[in-house]
Protein backbone atom coordinates (compact mmCIF):
# COMPACT_ATOMS: atom_id res chain seq x y z
CA UNK A 1 0.00 0.00 0.00
CA UNK A 2 1.37 3.42 -0.98
CA UNK A 3 1.36 6.14 1.63
CA UNK A 4 0.34 9.71 0.92
CA UNK A 5 2.53 12.13 2.81
CA UNK A 6 1.35 15.68 3.37
CA UNK A 7 3.88 18.40 4.12
CA UNK A 8 2.18 20.51 6.77
CA UNK A 9 2.16 24.24 6.09
CA UNK A 10 -0.52 25.99 8.13
CA UNK A 11 -2.90 28.38 6.37
CA UNK A 12 -1.49 27.65 2.92
CA UNK A 13 -4.18 26.83 0.38
CA UNK A 14 -3.44 24.60 -2.60
CA UNK A 15 -5.06 23.98 -5.95
CA UNK A 16 -7.06 20.77 -6.29
CA UNK A 17 -4.78 19.09 -8.81
CA UNK A 18 -5.18 15.62 -10.34
CA UNK A 19 -2.43 13.02 -10.14
CA UNK A 20 0.73 14.01 -11.97
CA UNK A 21 -0.13 17.72 -12.09
CA UNK A 22 1.65 20.27 -9.92
CA UNK A 23 0.58 23.92 -9.93
CA UNK A 24 3.58 25.98 -8.87
CA UNK A 25 2.04 29.43 -9.33
CA UNK A 26 0.68 31.55 -6.49
CA UNK A 27 -2.61 30.38 -5.03
CA UNK A 28 -5.59 32.69 -5.41
CA UNK A 29 -9.23 31.85 -4.77
CA UNK A 30 -10.20 33.52 -8.04
CA UNK A 31 -7.58 31.55 -9.97
CA UNK A 32 -8.86 28.36 -8.33
CA UNK A 33 -12.14 28.81 -10.22
CA UNK A 34 -10.11 28.42 -13.42
CA UNK A 35 -7.66 25.78 -12.17
CA UNK A 36 -10.29 23.22 -11.18
CA UNK A 37 -9.44 19.54 -10.99
CA UNK A 38 -11.55 18.88 -14.09
CA UNK A 39 -9.94 21.67 -16.13
CA UNK A 40 -6.43 20.62 -15.11
CA UNK A 41 -7.28 17.01 -15.99
CA UNK A 42 -8.27 18.14 -19.49
CA UNK A 43 -5.02 20.10 -19.91
CA UNK A 44 -3.06 17.08 -18.66
CA UNK A 45 -4.82 14.81 -21.16
CA UNK A 46 -3.87 17.15 -24.00
CA UNK A 47 -0.28 17.38 -22.76
CA UNK A 48 0.14 13.61 -22.44
CA UNK A 49 -1.45 12.88 -25.80
CA UNK A 50 0.45 15.46 -27.82
CA UNK A 51 3.76 16.19 -26.08
CA UNK A 52 5.62 13.62 -28.16
CA UNK A 53 4.30 15.18 -31.37
CA UNK A 54 5.27 18.66 -30.16
CA UNK A 55 8.80 17.57 -29.24
CA UNK A 56 9.23 16.00 -32.68
CA UNK A 57 7.97 19.16 -34.39
CA UNK A 58 10.44 21.29 -32.41
CA UNK A 59 13.29 18.96 -33.36
CA UNK A 60 12.24 19.32 -37.00
CA UNK A 61 12.49 23.09 -36.57
CA UNK A 62 16.02 22.73 -35.23
CA UNK A 63 17.00 20.47 -38.10
CA UNK A 64 15.61 22.97 -40.62
CA UNK A 65 17.61 25.73 -38.89
CA UNK A 66 20.77 23.65 -39.22
CA UNK A 67 20.11 23.28 -42.95
CA UNK A 68 19.54 27.01 -43.41
CA UNK A 69 22.69 27.80 -41.44
CA UNK A 70 24.59 25.47 -43.78
CA UNK A 71 23.49 27.44 -46.83
CA UNK A 72 20.07 26.00 -47.73
CA UNK A 73 17.03 28.22 -48.29
CA UNK A 74 13.33 27.48 -47.71
CA UNK A 75 11.17 26.47 -50.64
CA UNK A 76 8.06 24.60 -51.74
CA UNK A 77 8.03 20.91 -50.79
CA UNK A 78 7.92 18.70 -53.92
CA UNK A 79 6.33 15.87 -51.92
CA UNK A 80 3.20 17.94 -51.22
CA UNK A 81 2.71 19.30 -54.73
CA UNK A 82 -0.49 17.23 -54.97
CA UNK A 83 -1.97 19.31 -52.13
CA UNK A 84 -1.01 22.62 -53.73
CA UNK A 85 -2.37 21.51 -57.11
CA UNK A 86 -5.42 19.67 -55.76
CA UNK A 87 -9.02 20.80 -56.13
CA UNK A 88 -10.19 20.95 -52.53
CA UNK A 89 -11.74 23.53 -50.22
CA UNK A 90 -11.87 24.23 -46.52
CA UNK A 91 -15.16 23.98 -44.63
CA UNK A 92 -17.57 26.86 -45.19
CA UNK A 93 -16.96 29.97 -43.10
CA UNK A 94 -19.44 30.16 -40.17
CA UNK A 95 -21.99 32.98 -40.65
CA UNK A 96 -21.02 34.49 -37.28
CA UNK A 97 -17.57 35.41 -38.61
CA UNK A 98 -18.22 35.91 -42.32
CA UNK A 99 -17.52 39.64 -41.93
CA UNK A 100 -14.12 40.34 -40.41
CA UNK A 101 -13.23 43.55 -42.23
CA UNK A 102 -11.64 45.15 -39.16
CA UNK A 103 -10.18 43.27 -36.20
CA UNK A 104 -8.66 44.81 -33.09
CA UNK A 105 -6.00 43.04 -31.06
CA UNK A 106 -4.69 43.37 -27.53
CA UNK A 107 -3.71 41.55 -24.34
CA UNK A 108 -6.20 39.72 -22.11
CA UNK A 109 -6.39 42.61 -19.64
CA UNK A 110 -9.80 43.40 -18.18
CA UNK A 111 -10.26 47.00 -19.37
CA UNK A 112 -8.71 46.17 -22.74
CA UNK A 113 -11.15 43.31 -23.30
CA UNK A 114 -14.18 45.49 -22.58
CA UNK A 115 -12.99 48.39 -24.73
CA UNK A 116 -12.01 46.11 -27.60
CA UNK A 117 -15.29 44.20 -27.60
CA UNK A 118 -17.11 47.56 -27.56
CA UNK A 119 -14.82 49.18 -30.14
CA UNK A 120 -16.94 48.76 -33.25
CA UNK A 121 -14.50 46.28 -34.77
CA UNK A 122 -15.93 43.05 -36.16
CA UNK A 123 -13.49 40.86 -34.19
CA UNK A 124 -11.36 41.21 -31.07
CA UNK A 125 -8.32 38.95 -30.87
CA UNK A 126 -7.53 38.50 -27.18
CA UNK A 127 -3.86 37.72 -26.89
CA UNK A 128 -1.95 35.32 -24.65
CA UNK A 129 1.04 35.59 -27.00
CA UNK A 130 3.14 38.53 -28.24
CA UNK A 131 1.03 41.26 -26.60
CA UNK A 132 1.22 39.63 -23.15
CA UNK A 133 4.09 39.13 -20.76
CA UNK A 134 3.31 35.55 -19.63
CA UNK A 135 3.66 35.98 -15.88
CA UNK A 136 1.48 33.78 -13.71
CA UNK A 137 -0.65 36.74 -12.65
CA UNK A 138 -1.19 37.95 -16.23
CA UNK A 139 -2.12 34.50 -17.52
CA UNK A 140 -4.54 33.57 -14.77
CA UNK A 141 -6.20 36.98 -14.63
CA UNK A 142 -6.52 36.74 -18.40
CA UNK A 143 -8.49 33.50 -18.09
CA UNK A 144 -10.72 35.00 -15.40
CA UNK A 145 -11.33 38.02 -17.63
CA UNK A 146 -12.18 35.94 -20.70
CA UNK A 147 -14.58 33.74 -18.75
CA UNK A 148 -16.37 36.84 -17.49
CA UNK A 149 -16.40 38.28 -21.02
CA UNK A 150 -17.90 35.16 -22.58
CA UNK A 151 -20.68 34.95 -19.99
CA UNK A 152 -21.33 38.69 -20.35
CA UNK A 153 -20.67 39.67 -16.74
CA UNK A 154 -17.33 41.44 -17.17
CA UNK A 155 -17.03 44.94 -15.66
CA UNK A 156 -14.11 47.17 -14.70
CA UNK A 157 -14.07 50.06 -12.23
CA UNK A 158 -11.46 52.66 -13.14
CA UNK A 159 -10.99 54.34 -9.76
CA UNK A 160 -8.82 57.15 -11.14
CA UNK A 161 -11.66 58.22 -13.46
CA UNK A 162 -14.48 56.95 -11.25
CA UNK A 163 -15.90 55.17 -14.27
CA UNK A 164 -17.36 51.69 -14.62
CA UNK A 165 -16.80 49.86 -17.90
CA UNK A 166 -19.17 47.14 -19.11
CA UNK A 167 -20.12 45.43 -22.36
CA UNK A 168 -22.46 46.95 -24.92
CA UNK A 169 -25.37 44.94 -26.29
CA UNK A 170 -23.51 44.51 -29.60
CA UNK A 171 -19.88 43.42 -29.34
CA UNK A 172 -17.09 42.19 -31.56
CA UNK A 173 -16.67 38.45 -32.05
CA UNK A 174 -14.00 37.00 -29.78
CA UNK A 175 -10.95 35.14 -31.04
CA UNK A 176 -8.20 33.98 -28.64
CA UNK A 177 -4.52 33.60 -29.51
CA UNK A 178 -2.63 31.07 -27.38
CA UNK A 179 1.15 31.01 -27.23
CA UNK A 180 3.30 29.28 -29.84
CA UNK A 181 4.35 25.64 -29.67
CA UNK A 182 7.86 26.54 -28.49
CA UNK A 183 6.89 28.27 -25.23
CA UNK A 184 6.56 26.32 -21.96
CA UNK A 185 4.33 27.04 -18.98
CA UNK A 186 6.74 26.63 -16.09
CA UNK A 187 4.13 27.24 -13.39
CA UNK A 188 2.28 24.02 -14.26
CA UNK A 189 4.20 20.74 -14.23
CA UNK A 190 2.71 17.62 -15.76
CA UNK A 191 4.50 14.38 -14.93
CA UNK A 192 7.43 16.49 -13.72
CA UNK A 193 7.83 18.56 -16.90
CA UNK A 194 6.63 22.10 -17.68
CA UNK A 195 3.39 22.00 -19.63
CA UNK A 196 3.26 23.28 -23.21
CA UNK A 197 2.14 26.90 -22.93
CA UNK A 198 -0.36 26.87 -25.78
CA UNK A 199 -2.05 23.70 -24.52
CA UNK A 200 -2.55 25.40 -21.15
CA UNK A 201 -3.92 28.53 -22.83
CA UNK A 202 -6.19 26.60 -25.17
CA UNK A 203 -7.22 23.92 -22.69
CA UNK A 204 -8.28 26.21 -19.85
CA UNK A 205 -10.09 28.66 -22.13
CA UNK A 206 -11.91 25.97 -24.11
CA UNK A 207 -12.89 23.93 -21.06
CA UNK A 208 -14.57 26.83 -19.28
CA UNK A 209 -16.09 28.67 -22.23
CA UNK A 210 -17.04 26.42 -25.14
CA UNK A 211 -20.69 25.95 -24.18
CA UNK A 212 -21.51 29.58 -23.41
CA UNK A 213 -19.47 30.84 -26.37
CA UNK A 214 -21.44 28.75 -28.85
CA UNK A 215 -24.67 30.24 -27.49
CA UNK A 216 -23.69 33.91 -27.26
CA UNK A 217 -20.90 34.39 -29.82
CA UNK A 218 -20.62 31.61 -32.36
CA UNK A 219 -24.23 30.85 -33.30
CA UNK A 220 -23.53 27.16 -32.84
CA UNK A 221 -19.87 27.34 -33.85
CA UNK A 222 -16.69 28.04 -31.91
CA UNK A 223 -14.75 28.87 -29.95
CA UNK A 224 -12.54 30.78 -32.41
CA UNK A 225 -8.76 31.01 -32.27
CA UNK A 226 -5.67 32.55 -33.84
CA UNK A 227 -2.66 30.23 -34.08
CA UNK A 228 0.83 31.80 -34.09
CA UNK A 229 4.44 31.07 -35.06
CA UNK A 230 3.99 27.86 -37.05
CA UNK A 231 6.75 26.86 -39.45
CA UNK A 232 5.38 23.67 -41.03
CA UNK A 233 2.08 21.93 -41.71
CA UNK A 234 2.98 19.17 -39.24
CA UNK A 235 2.43 21.78 -36.52
CA UNK A 236 -1.00 22.59 -37.96
CA UNK A 237 -1.77 18.87 -37.96
CA UNK A 238 -1.13 18.76 -34.20
CA UNK A 239 -3.52 21.67 -33.69
CA UNK A 240 -6.16 19.90 -35.78
CA UNK A 241 -5.83 16.82 -33.59
CA UNK A 242 -6.06 18.97 -30.45
CA UNK A 243 -9.27 20.51 -31.78
CA UNK A 244 -10.76 17.10 -32.56
CA UNK A 245 -9.83 15.86 -29.10
CA UNK A 246 -11.47 18.91 -27.50
CA UNK A 247 -14.63 18.56 -29.60
CA UNK A 248 -14.90 14.92 -28.60
CA UNK A 249 -14.48 15.78 -24.92
CA UNK A 250 -17.17 18.46 -25.17
CA UNK A 251 -19.55 16.35 -27.24
CA UNK A 252 -19.83 18.97 -29.99
CA UNK A 253 -19.73 18.54 -33.75
CA UNK A 254 -16.44 18.08 -35.53
CA UNK A 255 -15.50 21.36 -37.18
CA UNK A 256 -17.08 23.50 -34.45
CA UNK A 257 -13.75 25.01 -33.41
CA UNK A 258 -12.37 27.42 -36.01
CA UNK A 259 -8.95 29.01 -36.29
CA UNK A 260 -7.02 31.50 -38.37
CA UNK A 261 -3.32 30.78 -38.75
CA UNK A 262 -0.80 33.60 -38.70
CA UNK A 263 1.68 33.24 -41.53
CA UNK A 264 4.52 34.97 -39.74
CA UNK A 265 7.52 32.76 -40.42
CA UNK A 266 9.42 32.48 -43.67
CA UNK A 267 9.24 28.65 -43.82
CA UNK A 268 5.44 28.78 -43.39
CA UNK A 269 4.92 30.93 -46.49
CA UNK A 270 5.88 27.87 -48.54
CA UNK A 271 3.43 25.72 -46.55
CA UNK A 272 0.21 27.75 -46.75
CA UNK A 273 -1.78 25.24 -48.78
CA UNK A 274 -0.52 22.40 -46.62
CA UNK A 275 -1.42 24.25 -43.40
CA UNK A 276 -4.94 24.92 -44.66
CA UNK A 277 -5.25 21.31 -45.80
CA UNK A 278 -4.39 19.95 -42.35
CA UNK A 279 -6.91 22.33 -40.76
CA UNK A 280 -9.49 22.19 -43.55
CA UNK A 281 -12.36 21.24 -41.21
CA UNK A 282 -11.36 23.91 -38.68
CA UNK A 283 -9.92 26.77 -40.72
CA UNK A 284 -11.19 30.30 -41.18
CA UNK A 285 -8.17 31.55 -43.03
CA UNK A 286 -4.66 32.92 -42.81
CA UNK A 287 -3.30 36.25 -41.63
CA UNK A 288 -0.24 38.26 -42.69
CA UNK A 289 1.75 38.54 -39.46
CA UNK A 290 4.15 40.85 -41.19
CA UNK A 291 6.29 42.09 -38.28
CA UNK A 292 7.17 38.59 -37.09
CA UNK A 293 7.63 37.61 -40.74
CA UNK A 294 10.44 40.17 -41.03
CA UNK A 295 11.96 38.80 -37.82
CA UNK A 296 11.75 35.29 -39.24
CA UNK A 297 13.43 36.37 -42.50
CA UNK A 298 16.46 37.61 -40.55
CA UNK A 299 16.51 34.56 -38.28
CA UNK A 300 16.21 32.11 -41.18
CA UNK A 301 19.08 33.80 -43.02
CA UNK A 302 21.23 34.50 -39.95
CA UNK A 303 24.16 32.71 -41.60
CA UNK A 304 23.66 34.34 -45.02
CA UNK A 305 25.65 37.62 -45.16
CA UNK A 306 24.34 38.21 -48.69
CA UNK A 307 20.77 38.58 -47.35
CA UNK A 308 21.11 41.39 -44.83
CA UNK A 309 18.07 43.61 -44.36
CA UNK A 310 18.13 47.41 -44.56
CA UNK A 311 16.86 49.56 -41.69
CA UNK A 312 13.69 47.87 -40.45
CA UNK A 313 11.58 50.98 -41.08
CA UNK A 314 12.31 50.46 -44.80
CA UNK A 315 11.04 46.87 -44.85
CA UNK A 316 7.42 47.58 -45.69
CA UNK A 317 4.83 45.99 -47.93
CA UNK A 318 6.33 47.82 -50.90
CA UNK A 319 9.31 45.47 -50.85
CA UNK A 320 8.91 42.78 -53.52
CA UNK A 321 9.32 39.82 -51.15
CA UNK A 322 6.70 41.26 -48.77
CA UNK A 323 4.21 42.05 -51.54
CA UNK A 324 4.67 38.54 -52.96
CA UNK A 325 3.99 37.04 -49.53
CA UNK A 326 0.76 39.02 -49.22
CA UNK A 327 -0.39 38.20 -52.76
CA UNK A 328 0.30 34.48 -52.34
CA UNK A 329 -1.63 34.41 -49.07
CA UNK A 330 -4.66 36.07 -50.71
CA UNK A 331 -4.67 33.76 -53.72
CA UNK A 332 -4.20 30.65 -51.57
CA UNK A 333 -6.96 31.52 -49.10
CA UNK A 334 -9.52 32.46 -51.74
CA UNK A 335 -8.79 29.35 -53.75
CA UNK A 336 -9.60 27.32 -50.61
CA UNK A 337 -12.65 29.39 -49.60
CA UNK A 338 -11.40 31.14 -46.45
CA UNK A 339 -10.42 34.61 -45.24
CA UNK A 340 -7.17 36.29 -46.24
CA UNK A 341 -6.50 38.74 -43.41
CA UNK A 342 -4.22 41.75 -43.72
CA UNK A 343 -1.55 42.99 -41.35
CA UNK A 344 -1.34 45.17 -38.29
CA UNK A 345 -1.73 48.94 -38.23
CA UNK A 346 0.38 49.69 -35.16
CA UNK A 347 -0.04 53.47 -35.12
CA UNK A 348 -1.42 55.23 -32.05
CA UNK A 349 -3.33 58.53 -32.40
CA UNK A 350 -1.01 61.45 -31.56
CA UNK A 351 -3.21 63.71 -29.46
CA UNK A 352 -0.77 66.58 -28.86
CA UNK A 353 0.36 67.07 -32.48
CA UNK A 354 -2.51 67.31 -35.00
CA UNK A 355 -0.19 67.56 -38.00
CA UNK A 356 1.82 64.47 -37.04
CA UNK A 357 -1.43 62.68 -36.21
CA UNK A 358 -2.89 63.36 -39.65
CA UNK A 359 0.32 62.12 -41.31
CA UNK A 360 0.17 58.91 -39.26
CA UNK A 361 -3.51 58.35 -40.05
CA UNK A 362 -2.83 58.96 -43.73
CA UNK A 363 -0.22 56.18 -43.67
CA UNK A 364 -2.82 53.86 -42.14
CA UNK A 365 -5.40 54.87 -44.74
CA UNK A 366 -3.04 54.16 -47.64
CA UNK A 367 -1.94 50.84 -46.15
CA UNK A 368 -5.52 49.65 -45.70
CA UNK A 369 -6.55 50.75 -49.18
CA UNK A 370 -3.61 48.78 -50.54
CA UNK A 371 -4.74 45.70 -48.60
CA UNK A 372 -8.39 45.77 -49.64
CA UNK A 373 -7.56 46.48 -53.28
CA UNK A 374 -5.12 43.58 -53.26
CA UNK A 375 -7.96 41.30 -52.12
CA UNK A 376 -7.67 41.04 -48.34
CA UNK A 377 -10.93 40.35 -46.52
CA UNK A 378 -10.03 42.26 -43.38
CA UNK A 379 -7.25 43.87 -41.43
CA UNK A 380 -5.83 44.44 -37.95
CA UNK A 381 -5.70 47.58 -35.82
CA UNK A 382 -3.86 47.99 -32.53
CA UNK A 383 -5.87 50.99 -31.29
CA UNK A 384 -9.63 51.74 -31.27
CA UNK A 385 -8.90 55.15 -32.78
CA UNK A 386 -7.84 53.50 -36.04
CA UNK A 387 -11.02 51.47 -36.51
CA UNK A 388 -13.05 54.14 -38.38
CA UNK A 389 -10.25 54.66 -40.93
CA UNK A 390 -9.78 50.93 -41.47
CA UNK A 391 -13.54 50.39 -41.69
CA UNK A 392 -13.91 53.21 -44.20
CA UNK A 393 -11.20 51.77 -46.45
CA UNK A 394 -12.65 48.25 -46.49
CA UNK A 395 -16.32 49.23 -46.67
CA UNK A 396 -15.62 51.75 -49.40
CA UNK A 397 -14.20 48.98 -51.55
CA UNK A 398 -16.26 45.94 -50.46
CA UNK A 399 -19.61 47.64 -49.89
CA UNK A 400 -22.10 45.34 -48.19
CA UNK A 401 -20.25 42.14 -49.10
CA UNK A 402 -18.96 40.50 -45.91
CA UNK A 403 -15.70 39.51 -47.57
CA UNK A 404 -13.95 39.10 -50.93
CA UNK A 405 -13.55 35.32 -50.89
CA UNK A 406 -15.74 34.80 -53.95
CA UNK A 407 -15.86 38.30 -55.41
CA UNK A 408 -12.15 38.75 -56.13
CA UNK A 409 -10.69 37.08 -59.21
CA UNK A 410 -8.72 34.02 -58.14
CA UNK A 411 -5.36 34.49 -59.78
CA UNK A 412 -3.05 31.52 -60.03
CA UNK A 413 -0.93 31.18 -56.90
CA UNK A 414 1.65 29.22 -58.90
CA UNK A 415 2.59 32.46 -60.66
CA UNK A 416 4.37 33.56 -57.47
CA UNK A 417 7.72 31.80 -57.34
CA UNK A 418 10.28 30.93 -54.69
CA UNK A 419 12.45 33.69 -56.14
CA UNK A 420 9.66 36.23 -55.57
CA UNK A 421 9.31 35.20 -51.94
CA UNK A 422 13.05 35.24 -51.27
CA UNK A 423 14.06 38.37 -53.19
CA UNK A 424 16.57 40.36 -51.16
CA UNK A 425 15.02 43.65 -49.96
CA UNK A 426 16.61 46.93 -50.96
CA UNK A 427 17.50 49.92 -48.83
CA UNK A 428 20.17 51.55 -46.72
CA UNK A 429 21.56 50.65 -43.32
CA UNK A 430 22.15 53.56 -40.98
CA UNK A 431 23.46 54.38 -37.54
CA UNK A 432 20.00 55.71 -36.72
CA UNK A 433 18.60 52.28 -37.62
CA UNK A 434 21.00 50.68 -35.14
CA UNK A 435 20.05 53.27 -32.53
CA UNK A 436 16.31 52.78 -33.01
CA UNK A 437 16.64 49.00 -32.76
CA UNK A 438 18.58 49.39 -29.52
CA UNK A 439 16.33 52.01 -27.96
CA UNK A 440 13.10 50.19 -28.77
CA UNK A 441 14.46 46.74 -27.90
CA UNK A 442 15.64 47.78 -24.44
CA UNK A 443 12.46 49.69 -23.59
CA UNK A 444 10.19 46.88 -24.75
CA UNK A 445 12.14 44.28 -22.77
CA UNK A 446 12.07 46.48 -19.65
CA UNK A 447 8.29 46.68 -19.91
CA UNK A 448 7.96 42.94 -20.59
CA UNK A 449 10.01 42.08 -17.49
CA UNK A 450 7.64 44.19 -15.37
CA UNK A 451 4.48 42.62 -16.76
CA UNK A 452 3.58 44.62 -19.89
CA UNK A 453 3.65 42.91 -23.28
CA UNK A 454 1.93 45.63 -25.31
CA UNK A 455 3.91 48.87 -25.08
CA UNK A 456 3.37 52.31 -26.67
CA UNK A 457 6.72 53.55 -28.03
CA UNK A 458 7.22 56.52 -30.35
CA UNK A 459 3.57 56.62 -31.45
CA UNK A 460 3.41 52.89 -32.24
CA UNK A 461 1.91 50.06 -30.19
CA UNK A 462 4.75 47.57 -29.99
CA UNK A 463 4.68 43.91 -29.03
CA UNK A 464 7.33 41.19 -28.88
CA UNK A 465 7.73 41.11 -32.67
CA UNK A 466 9.36 44.55 -32.67
CA UNK A 467 11.86 43.57 -29.99
CA UNK A 468 12.65 40.41 -31.93
CA UNK A 469 13.32 42.30 -35.18
CA UNK A 470 15.52 44.77 -33.29
CA UNK A 471 17.48 42.01 -31.58
CA UNK A 472 18.16 39.79 -34.58
CA UNK A 473 18.99 42.68 -36.91
CA UNK A 474 21.49 44.10 -34.42
CA UNK A 475 22.98 40.63 -33.98
CA UNK A 476 23.36 40.12 -37.73
CA UNK A 477 24.84 43.56 -38.34
CA UNK A 478 27.40 43.03 -35.56
CA UNK A 479 28.17 39.48 -36.70
CA UNK A 480 29.02 40.57 -40.25
CA UNK A 481 30.44 44.03 -39.54
CA UNK A 482 27.88 45.73 -41.75
CA UNK A 483 28.86 49.05 -43.28
CA UNK A 484 26.43 51.81 -42.40
CA UNK A 485 25.94 53.43 -45.77
CA UNK A 486 22.80 55.49 -45.43
CA UNK A 487 24.00 58.50 -43.44
CA UNK A 488 27.38 59.10 -45.05
CA UNK A 489 29.39 57.76 -42.12
CA UNK A 490 30.77 54.69 -43.84
CA UNK A 491 31.60 53.03 -40.51
CA UNK A 492 31.25 49.34 -39.83
CA UNK A 493 29.17 47.93 -37.01
CA UNK A 494 31.28 46.30 -34.31
CA UNK A 495 30.80 45.31 -30.68
CA UNK A 496 32.68 48.47 -29.72
CA UNK A 497 30.40 50.71 -31.79
CA UNK A 498 27.36 48.89 -30.47
CA UNK A 499 28.61 49.37 -26.90
CA UNK A 500 28.83 53.13 -27.43
CA UNK A 501 25.36 53.17 -28.99
CA UNK A 502 23.95 51.29 -25.99
CA UNK A 503 25.45 53.80 -23.55
CA UNK A 504 24.13 56.78 -25.49
CA UNK A 505 20.68 55.28 -25.97
CA UNK A 506 20.39 54.43 -22.28
CA UNK A 507 21.08 58.10 -21.52
CA UNK A 508 18.39 59.07 -24.01
CA UNK A 509 15.90 56.60 -22.51
CA UNK A 510 16.54 58.01 -19.03
CA UNK A 511 15.84 61.55 -20.29
CA UNK A 512 12.68 60.46 -22.10
CA UNK A 513 11.10 58.42 -19.30
CA UNK A 514 12.41 60.48 -16.38
CA UNK A 515 14.89 59.60 -13.65
CA UNK A 516 12.36 58.12 -11.23
CA UNK A 517 10.80 55.75 -13.75
CA UNK A 518 14.23 54.82 -15.06
CA UNK A 519 15.51 54.09 -11.56
CA UNK A 520 12.45 52.10 -10.49
CA UNK A 521 12.02 50.23 -13.77
CA UNK A 522 14.09 47.33 -15.07
CA UNK A 523 15.93 49.28 -17.76
CA UNK A 524 19.42 48.31 -16.59
CA UNK A 525 18.49 44.64 -16.38
CA UNK A 526 16.84 44.83 -19.80
CA UNK A 527 19.92 46.55 -21.21
CA UNK A 528 22.19 43.74 -20.00
CA UNK A 529 19.90 41.06 -21.44
CA UNK A 530 19.40 42.83 -24.76
CA UNK A 531 23.13 43.55 -25.14
CA UNK A 532 23.97 39.93 -24.37
CA UNK A 533 21.46 38.75 -26.97
CA UNK A 534 22.84 41.08 -29.65
CA UNK A 535 26.48 40.12 -29.06
CA UNK A 536 26.13 36.38 -28.38
CA UNK A 537 28.13 33.97 -30.58
CA UNK A 538 24.93 32.06 -31.43
CA UNK A 539 21.51 33.59 -32.07
CA UNK A 540 18.77 32.44 -29.71
CA UNK A 541 15.55 31.44 -31.47
CA UNK A 542 13.28 33.65 -29.36
CA UNK A 543 13.98 36.50 -26.97
CA UNK A 544 10.84 35.72 -24.97
CA UNK A 545 12.04 32.15 -24.45
CA UNK A 546 15.58 33.19 -23.53
CA UNK A 547 14.42 35.58 -20.78
CA UNK A 548 11.29 33.69 -19.68
CA UNK A 549 12.83 32.41 -16.44
CA UNK A 550 13.12 35.99 -15.19
CA UNK A 551 9.32 36.21 -14.83
CA UNK A 552 8.70 32.69 -13.48
CA UNK A 553 7.71 32.74 -9.79
CA UNK A 554 7.41 29.30 -8.21
CA UNK A 555 5.63 28.73 -4.94
CA UNK A 556 6.18 25.70 -2.67
CA UNK A 557 4.56 22.35 -3.39
CA UNK A 558 2.36 21.61 -0.43
CA UNK A 559 1.46 17.99 -1.04
CA UNK A 560 3.86 15.27 -2.12
CA UNK A 561 2.76 11.83 -3.24
CA UNK A 562 5.39 9.20 -2.51
From Swiss-Prot:
Pfam families: MS_C, MS_N, MS_TIM-barrel
Protein EC: 2.3.3.9
The keyword 4Fe-4S is assigned to this record: no
Record GO biological process: glyoxylate cycle; tricarboxylic acid cycle
Alphabetized Gene3D superfamilies for the sequence: Malate synthase, domain 3, Malate synthase, domain III
Domain of life: Eukaryota
GO CC, alphabetical: glyoxysome
Motif (Microbody targeting signal): 560-562
Location(s), subcellular: Glyoxysome
Knockout-associated phenotype: No visible phenotype under normal growth conditions, but the frequency of mutant seedlings to establish into plantlets with true leaves is decreased under short day conditions.
Family: Belongs to the malate synthase family.
Role played: Does not seem to be essential for lipid utilization and gluconeogenesis in seedlings.
Protein name: Malate synthase
